[in-house]
Structure formats: structure tokens, C-alpha cells
Amino acid sequence: MKYKKTILATTILSALLILIALGVSLVVSPMVERKAEQLLTRYAARVGAIERCSFSRVEFSPLSRSLTLHDVLVIYRSPKGLRKSMDRLEISVPLRAAACAVPSLRPYVLPENGSMDVCNSITADGVSFSMPGLLAGSLKHAAISGVSADARHVRAILDGRRPEPVDLLEHAVIDGLDAVNLRATVQTGTGSAACTLGAFRLRGLHDLGIEEIRFEQLNAATNKERAGIALFGMDGFRAPDAATLRLLLSVRLDGKKSPQALDKDIEHVLPMLQQWLTATIPPVRVLAVEKASFRGSRPQDVMSLDLMRLDWLSNRPREMKTAVKDLVLPAQLVESNGLHLPGLKELRFNGESDTRDEDGRIRETGYLSLARFGQLRYNASYAVPGGVFNFSLMQLLSMTIHDAAFSFVDQGALAYIALNQHDPDMAGPYFNQALDYSFPGRDNDALRAALKVFTDRPGTLDIVKTTSEPTPLLRCFDVATLGRLWRVSATPGKESLYDQMRRLAPAR
């Protein structure tokens, strides 16, 4: 019986609260709606770039603390003629943030410092935008959620002051940002370009970093060219620290500057970029492009990519993986530079690499392949001054090689090189003469013999460093010591060089 009375009392109390809330809604909502309309109109008038701002009606829900504007139209003075419209714009804010908008309540609800939630969500439906003779587009839906900011910046904005941009960004938090079905047409000097974006997604913007960014079904087209990407994604993006970011933004690489001034700016920027790229936490953890394509004005101008991916997990210790799958380029891309590739319409690249720290050195393994040319596999251990690449030529030249092994399987590369000689029928003697000239001395006898086997019947060429002792990079290419430093062996292929040439270019 006692529990039944408790349940009954709770039910009655809940009903009363609901009735009170409904009563408050009926009284307060019209007041808030009128006030919001006045504030929005007043704000639009204060912003010099806005010429006109209007909406058909305003709705306020005190229970959800959401404000909804219908049929929004904004016309800008600058850029001239820019128009934006939305069928519906809804803004939902936390109770504290809503109270901060009331000057008499602000001292009691707005803290002196620290992070505070300023917006639960903002959603916009049926967005369109245009500039006469330049731009026209639409966006089906956009939403932003979980926005937080430093209380100092909230106070500054409410007082009409503009916070310093980097400081504002450093303390801002956005849980999510989504956009669906963006379409735009841009007028150019030679015609028009159409762009579409199926979806955009951002997750976890905080501490000058972004946890996830996705662009899906991104396409662009003109009257003669088309390009598209099924997916562009980035995880774990980290911008430079606030101090470095301010310095980078202060440097303006203006095309009107003199070459001397530009060189000075670049010299100022490069060390900061090196510091950003070589920090313990990489600037981006994952970068990926999937299903990219390009089609030019001519039928042969076709390029495509199935996958390109970078996994940059750490700089200290070094850990990185890269992959390229089916990068296809037209053969005419290299033929236009004088290289003749009979019977070949496309160049198809594939490759993978795995780089990681191993006993204080960097171990790199992987392969590169070009269809109908050959495949190279490698496994090398090396060290660089400082232990981390700083993307400088001096550091690259100062690196030392410990152990290294390379294996190349010929699938037509040598035959194509021979076919591009002045007299292809004399390619064999020419190769032998070039080997005798390039690798003289008795120390290179075994190396020359192996290379001559390979050029006579292209098959597999294996090159292995004979010692694991650290060797300066430049010394690895010293002709006088190549034969002692590298062991070269060749496995003959099934066809001779001339048989390959006849198969690749039978009409020669």
C-alpha cells in the first residue's frame, strides 16, 4: 500500500510539472520568439557585410531550449550579390548558455574561466547560396553538435569583442560536424565547373587537432574534364602548437613580395614546419584516398587510383606504413617526353612500405612494381643523424646504411630500354660496353659478370650488402668499392633480351 501511494504521488507530481512546463511554454515562448526576432534583426543591421536578413517565423521550445527559424534569407553587401537561404535553421543551447544571453543573469551563470558548453546542436535544412554570374549551389542538410568554448571567449563575444583566432581555436571543442549532398556550379573564364559532395563528416575537434575527417563522393567536372574521389579520409590530425601556428599565420607568402622577401619568409617557415613534422606525435595518423579518377579532354587522358594510404603512427619510435594500389597513368604521359613504349597503353603502379625502429636504427621493407616493367623488393636498415628525419638534404646525405638487400624481377623494363636506343639491334653490345666502362677494375669482375647475365637474359637480379657495418650513403655508390661492398647475382630469364624485344614490338 505504501509503495502504491508513493507511485501515485510521483505520478501526480510529474503531471503537475508537465502542466507547469506547458503553461510556462505558452507564456514564455511568444516572449522569447519576439525577443529573438528583434535581436537577430538588430544583429544583421550591425554587421556591415549583411544588407538584409529575414525569416518567415520563429519558434522557441523552453523544454528543449531550441530556437527554430523558418525560411531564412541573408543578402550580403560583401561579397556583393551573395545570397544564402535556409528552409529551416534550428539552434539548441544548454540552459547556462541560454542564461548567459540575458545581461542581468550573466554575472551569475558565466564563469570567469574554464570550458563551458555553448551549443548542443545547430541544424540547417534546404540551404542554397548564389552569386550572380559566379556561383550557385545547394546543401540538403548540415549539422554541428557538442560545441564548447572557453568562458573568456564567450564573455568577449557577448561584449562585442573578437577573441584572438588561434586562442579561440585552441580552446574550442566540436564533437561533430556533418553535411549531406552539396552541389555547386562555379562560372569560370572558359565556361563552368560543377562540384558535388555526397557527404562530409568531422569528429572530435579539440586541442588544435581533429580525430576524424571524411569527404565522400567528391566530384568535379567541366565541359572537357572530370575528376572524382570516392573517399578522402584523415584521422588523428594535429596542428602545430599555438605559438608555432601564430608564427606561421603571421608569415604571408604574398606574390607581390620581392624574391628576396619571399626567400626570407620561406627560411623563417621551414624550421617551424620541420619541427611540426618531426615531433613525437606525427601531424596526421592516417591519410587515405580511395577510388580516385581523372578523365581529360582526350580519350587517352585517363588516370585512376584504387587506394593510397599512409599510416603515420609515430616518429619516436619511428613507425610508418604506406601503400599504393593500382595507380594507373596513360603511357602517353611518358611517351610525350620521348620514351617509346610500343604496345603499352597504361602504366600501372603498386607498392607498399613498412618503416619502424629496430635496435636504434630504422628498418624499411617493401616493394614497388610497375606492370609489364618489373618489381623491386627491398629490405634495408639505416640510421640518420638525430634518429628522426627532418626532411633536409644534408641529413639525407649524412645517413649510414647498415644492411640492405634488393631483388628486381624484370618483366620487360630492360627490353623497353633497349627499344629506345638509337640502334635497338645493337643494344646487347652497347649494354656490355657500358658495363665495362661504368664498373672497371678487378674488384668489380663478379659484379660485371652478373649484370651481363642479366642484360643477356633478363630475369632476377639480387643485390646484397656484404657487411652490416655502418657505411656512409655516398660511399655505397663509390665505383671503386662497389664490388667489395655489394654482392650481385643474376638468375637468367626464360627469354633472351632480343626475344623480349621482338615480343613487345613485333612490327619493329
Task: Put a short name on every predicted segment.
Residues 1-5:
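Short, Lys/Arg-rich N-terminal segment immediately upstream of the first membrane anchor
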Residues 16-23:
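Low-complexity, highly charged intrinsically disordered N-terminal segments
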Residues 6-11, 23-508:
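Glycine-rich, small/hydroxylated-residue low-complexity segments
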